[in-house]
């Protein structure tokens, strides 16, 4: 490539050009996992971070931390999960090892999306966070102020993510059926 007077060294454009980048991004995403031990990075975290709605509580650990801090957004988890599922579908017949890791990470995201549904249109949606917690309930660092919202457009997006996951994660008929059911419910909200 030549830009002005600058010239890059010669490089080859090859088949499967993006696989190295996909592995690196996938490993970074794994390191951002919340509620899961990441060897050499952190132990299980934020189990005692909770949302509350209608007399019920849900632990908000799961999904992935934001890259800049420890915050969480369920809708962003949906966006990342959808991208991982799309990449999985493209790689499943080309690079089975990469596809398996993409699928595993997408399943982690699906679990977080599903566990934060209250089933009445409301969902734990987000929390800005800058601290590590001890993971023990009823101690000084417990946080129960995770935002809970019922947003029609967000529910529409979740329905799409859940439906796509239902079509993609085809090795677990019970999960497929559940994803399809909640997609229909979320679409109606």
Please provide the spans of the model-predicted regions.
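Acidic/aromatic-lined carbohydrate-recognition and catalytic surfaces
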Residues: 14-19, 95-99, 103, 158
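Alpha-helical packing segments of well-folded alpha/beta enzyme cores
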Residues: 76, 83-84, 102-105, 109, ...
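Low-complexity, Ser/Thr/Pro/Gly-enriched N-terminal "stalk/linker" regions
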Residues: 2-79, 108-147
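Structural helix-adjacent loops and short alpha-helical linkers that scaffold large soluble proteins
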Residues: 6, 88-107, 121-122, 148-151, ...
């Amino acid at each position: 490539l030549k830009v002005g007077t600058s010239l890059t060294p010669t490089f080859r454009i090859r088949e499967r050009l993006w696989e190295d980048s996909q592995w690196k991004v996938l490993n970074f995403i794994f390191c951002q996992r919340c509620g899961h031990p990441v060897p050499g990075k952190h132990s299980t975290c934020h189990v005692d971070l909770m949302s509350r709605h209608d007399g019920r509580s849900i632990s908000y650990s799961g999904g992935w931390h934001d890259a800049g801090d420890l915050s969480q957004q369920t809708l962003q988890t949906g966006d990342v999960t959808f991208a991982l599922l799309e990449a999985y579908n493209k790689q499943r017949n080309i690079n089975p090892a990469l596809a398996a890791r993409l699928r595993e990470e997408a399943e982690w995201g699906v679990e977080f999306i599903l566990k934060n549904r209250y089933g009445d249109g409301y969902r734990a949606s987000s929390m800005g966070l800058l601290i590590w917690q001890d993971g023990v309930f009823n101690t000084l660092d417990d946080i129960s102020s995770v935002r809970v919202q019922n947003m029609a457009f967000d529910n529409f997006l979740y329905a799409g993510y859940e439906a796509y996951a239902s079509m993609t994660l085809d090795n677990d008929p019970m999960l497929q059926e559940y994803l399809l059911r909640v997609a229909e419910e979320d679409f109606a909200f």
